[in-house]
C-alpha cells in the first residue's frame, strides 16, 4: 500500500465538556517510518482516543490516513486503519480492558506494508 507524503499528527483525546486534546505538526513531510505513542485511552460514551498521521493536502489529493482509534465505550476494541481510496476500516478485539492502563501504541509504515502494535 503506497501513500503520498504526509504530515505527522498526534491527537490524544477529547474529554466530554472540556474538549482537551493535543496535535503535533511538522513543517517537514515524512514518508515511511515507525510511529509510537504511549497513552491511556479515555473511557466513556462519546469519547475517542486516537493516534494518527494523514495527508494534509486534501482536497487537492486523495485522503490518506493511518490511524489507531479507541472508542471510550468499548473496553476491548481497537480500530487499526490504513485509509485511502477503496480501503476499509478494521476493528480488532484485545483480551484486556484497554482503558485501565497506559500502553504503547504504534505502527510501522514501509513501501510494502503497514504493521500496527500495542
What are these regions, as identified by a protein language model?
Residues 17-118:
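GH16 jelly-roll
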